[in-house]
Amino acid sequence: MGPEPASTVLTAEQEAIAVAFRRHTLLPLDDCLYALYATIPQLSRPALHRCFQRHGTSRLPLGEAGQSPPKKKCKDYPIGYLPVDLAEVQTEEGKQYLFVAIDRTSQVAFAERHPRAKRVVAAEFLRRVLDKLPYQVPTVLTDNGVQFTPQAHQFLPGGHSFDRICREYGVEHRLTKLAHSWTNGQVERMNRTIKEATVQRYHYQTTNELNGHLQAFLLAYNHAKRLKTLRGLTPHEFVCAQWQKNPTIFTRDPTHLTLGLYT
């Protein structure tokens, strides 16, 4: 038999990244796909599966007893750990930008569309999210993008506007490690979910149409989408359950709140 045919989707460097990630994490195929999608946007499930087959990593190694290794348990985060990210979308009016935030534990999600991805836009988006959430947010996680943190060559008198909002609200701003974008994979997956539910499925004549549908989708997601990770609860129901368990971390009763930025 000859050598396995080379990928027509992935470069040699991208294949090396995918295989190294698989061998290091021992994660299932779908988890690898979600984590690597931010680094390799054109990646698909079949392409990743074929890549693993070519490199002999399509099957996870067996443990000492001949069993598959136990799944690694994700680190538990208290409610209020908030990844924030930026995504590009194409519309009739040109390139637009989505700022997205999702609570890692409650899964409550917020997003806004903007024509520009400026520092002040990111900062004001964060302010609106923090004002809307009915509980304390101790930590915000972002990548090293210019919208979220100063770059090496920049001098910003008074500091970065995103960091100023964090200080104002008493929030710790953490950054993902360079070349480790999968550490912010949850919000990357939410980016993908939003795109699949909006711009990849519908044609919008104006960005106002996109805005309206985006906010309607998020309201339905927060209040009607029952999630397996929340044991069948919606994000809003989970927040209300946390209110009953630990009201001290809340700033107000969430029971009758509508979890949307413009409601």
Give, region by region, the residue ranges found by the protein language model.
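Short small-residue beta-strand/loop micro-motif enriched in glycine and branched aliphatics
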Residues: 107-112, 174-176, 200-201
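Basic, flexible linker segments flanking DNA-binding modules
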Residues: 1-17, 21-84, 146, 153, ...
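A short acidic/small-residue loop/turn micro-motif
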Residues: 115-119
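C-terminal domain-tail junction helix/linker
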Residues: 167-171, 192-263
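RNase H-like polynucleotidyl transferase catalytic core
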Residues: 141-142, 162-186, 202-207
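Acidic/histidine-rich, metal-coordinating catalytic segments
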Residues: 133-155, 179, 184, 231-236
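Mobile-element integrase/transposase regions
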Residues: 46, 53-103, 108, 120-124, ...
